[in-house]
Amino acid sequence: MYNLFKSVIETDRSAVVICDVNHKIVYMNKMAVTRYHKDLTGSSLLDCHNAKSNEIIVKVVDWFRQSPKNNMIYTYHNTKENKDVYMVALRDDEENLIGYYEKHEYRNPETAELYDFSKSLI
């Protein structure tokens, strides 16, 4: 089963970077390594962003911790690449937060408000 799941991630055309709850990068798919020009596995995601971005990342992860219903939040639209970007909670079978990742969806613009903490999108 592991190989099936890994294959899904590895064949995704979007960069996939998975972090644990302490912001440590635990996995990058091939597209992520290509996009960011190196494998950052083992590094802190917070070392890859500026202070303002780090503040938002920490706030989102805190929101994920508040409720098992808080699982996905819209973060921005990239007009140049026509994609929406989300942060997504990863949970174990007991719905405990075990990590998160950034999801890129290439499509029409999102209709939700940016960082709308009043609802989860999934």
Predicted regions and their residues:
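Sensory/regulatory domains in signal-transduction proteins
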Residues: 27, 31-116
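Sensory modules in modular signal-transduction proteins
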Residues: 1-32
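Non-catalytic regulatory/interaction regions at protein termini and inter-domain linkers
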Residues: 120-122
